[in-house]
């Protein structure tokens, strides 16, 4: 199913008080690590499209899911050889490995596994 051409990849999971589902911290690293690198079920470009551009287009969010002039500059810089999910049912907030930087709205929000700006971005409804 993950390789279906019409499919998109998203998650609505959250972590609250250290409790939740491991997909809250691991959905996208799992796609890149397991389904792209390990199993080859998706190319890296197709996985990126399914995780970013396709959902943004479906939700009619023209400034999301792409890199370009006027876009929101939400970026995740990761090492494709190392990215992997680590969250489990007993430790759902464990951060993934292989993510170097996260930029939200052009602001550096995460370096390695350390949040450096927890106020980057805006709430979307």
Ranges and model annotations:
Residues 1-6, 11-12, 76-122:
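C-terminal cap of metal-dependent C-N hydrolases
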Residues 1-80:
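His/Asp/Glu-enriched, well-ordered alpha-helical/loop segment
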């Amino acid at each position: 199913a993950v390789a279906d051409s019409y499919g998109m990849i998203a998650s609505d999971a959250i972590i609250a008080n250290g409790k939740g589902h491991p997909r809250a911290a691991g959905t996208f690293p799992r796609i890149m690590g397991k389904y792209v690198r390990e199993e080859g079920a998706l190319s890296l470009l197709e996985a990126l499209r399914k995780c970013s551009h396709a959902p943004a287009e479906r939700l009619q969010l023209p400034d999301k899911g792409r890199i370009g002039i006027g876009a929101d500059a939400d970026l995740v810089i990761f090492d494709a050889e190392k990215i992997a999910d680590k969250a489990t049912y007993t430790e759902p907030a464990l951060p993934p490995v292989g993510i170097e930087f996260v930029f939200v709205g052009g602001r550096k929000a995460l370096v390695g596994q350390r949040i450096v700006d927890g106020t980057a971005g805006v709430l979307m409804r």
